[in-house]
Amino acid sequence: MPLMVQSAPSTEAIQLPKTSESAQLKRIRHTMSHVMAMAVQKLFPKAQVTIGPWTETGFYYDFDTPEPFTEADLKAIKKEMVKIIQQKLPVVREEVSREEAQQRIEALGEPYKLEILQGLTEPITLYHLGDRWWDLCAGPHVETTAELNPKAFDLESVAGAYWRGDETKAQLQRIYGTAWETPEQLTEYKRRKEEALKRDHRKLGRELGLFLFADPVGPGLPLWTPKGTILRSTLEDFLKQEQMKRGYQSVVTPHLARVDLFKVSGHWQNYREDMFPMMAEDDEARGLEQGFVLKPMNCPFHIQIYKNELRSYRELPIRLAEFGTVYRYEQSGELGGLTRVRGFTVDDSHLFVRPDQLASEFLSVVDLILSVFKALNLKKFKARLSFRDPESDKYIGSDDVWEKAESAIQAAAETLGMDYFIGVGEAAFYGPKLDFIFQDALDREWQLGTVQVDYNLPERFDLEYVAEDGSRQRPVMIHRAPFGSLERLIGILIEEYAGDFPLWLAPEQIRLLPVTETVLDYCQQVADQLRAIGVRVQVDCSGDRLGKLIRNAEKAKIPVMAVIGAQEAESETLSIRTRATGDLGSLTVADLTKRLSSAIAEKLPHL
């Protein structure tokens, strides 16, 4: 139940700070979550508190309550929060022993906090709001509620959430809020959120008839309609053509494999919690070693194709490419339209290269990714060098191998003069990555293309090639995916374009609008000529008045409309209208065909 207001045009130029860049904003939001919890427990004494962190746009807190919160409850909670803020309560940090913390929590009857305490190491810290309320928390916070602006926050919605993200545990009530440093920032945030709701790919995807989710199929498993399938196929065909120019070879691999394959790759040991459960083969008595799992990644399959024969140094680089569907067991609460699904298609490719080819092939992959972004008119992006966290044990391979791979990626980024930043802990478990972070029309960030250098999987699978001197040498692998995930890309494109796809990408590129039934035969003749050159065209045979025909085409966001009446049929012309530029006047079929062919081939946004 989002609570939104119409913003004023004067806020257009406001730059919203990001939590990651503003320590004060982080403190404001973290303290605001505590203020909200204090208000909730005053108004609803039976509510038990769990966790309440800051987020990139605000904060939330999870509560265990006898009854769900209502819209009226949110208003009352917000009003109470304003009272707490205006009291200018000091926010005091206190260190206590584990025993002291346990005694205090037990005295309050807070079982969730007691469970949290069990997983903490000393010193245990508490944060107090005045002398009336405290929370088990590591901070940071503001020093007093006087630093919180009562006109710069709002409570937005209530949602269900499972304790610890575990569907088998208690379902809680999560209240989401947003908080900023100034009222102007709050107004601008709400304006952007309202625009985001208009662009929401779930809403537009339904209205434009592109995809759907069905309960009998299951959550996170999208179904693609004919129009949505055209959109997917157009993107796939585009990338396949670009890959063919660069010497890629297409392969096809199955959707599942024996678990042993993923034990060798390390996925079973390091990625198992994100994989679907194992399926037993025929008779469970044959043992779990014979079990099958849905693939979470395509790389082990491409490795098997490489290993099928002994390779010569002359054959390398070998570039294997596949639009392969993979499966990740995302929690239901983490699913979100097309951007977070359980089954998705990756534009995957794995390059097997000699060490002396690594730099040039890496640069070539980056060039491909940049050309894809250009064709899609995705202009605002930055590069993240995703390196391992040396303090974590979730990675495979030696320090030397990791340092070599990370150095190769950083050298490539510097050679290209890229604006990059390093993301420690963002690497895949088997190797570092160069990730492209796209910033959309609403300044939200999404990870799209990625390219990875991998010395580990060639070692684990004992990959070899025959060198020029006859010795057996180890190739280096490059993993790359310009789109990242086809589903996520389409979700992002729907929102970036607000459903107004560029002409070359639109599922329906032109709609013919007959003014009377007497011109239907002529419309079908024109449609046949356009289809013959690959143009996606439909004839509106509904019989509605012209005004409604145009409105329906506008609502469906068709790039080009051709109005055809008796005069056009007699002169064998069409009256052309586009969404982007309005009326183009009268064109012959030959002229329209020529202009459409040229615009689509050049991937122009409109006619």
From Swiss-Prot:
Main location: cytoplasm
UniProt keywords, alphabetically: Aminoacyl-tRNA synthetase, ATP-binding, Cytoplasm, Ligase, Metal-binding, Nucleotide-binding, Protein biosynthesis, RNA-binding, tRNA-binding, Zinc
GO MF annotation terms: ATP binding; metal ion binding; threonine-tRNA ligase activity; tRNA binding
Enzyme class name: ligase
Pfam families, per the entry: HGTP_anticodon, tRNA-synt_2b, tRNA_SAD
Catalysed transformations (reactions): tRNA(Thr) + L-threonine + ATP = L-threonyl-tRNA(Thr) + AMP + diphosphate + H(+)
Subunit structure: Homodimer.
Name of the protein described by the UniProt record: Threonine--tRNA ligase
Higher taxonomy: Bacteria, Bacillati, Cyanobacteriota, Cyanophyceae, Synechococcales
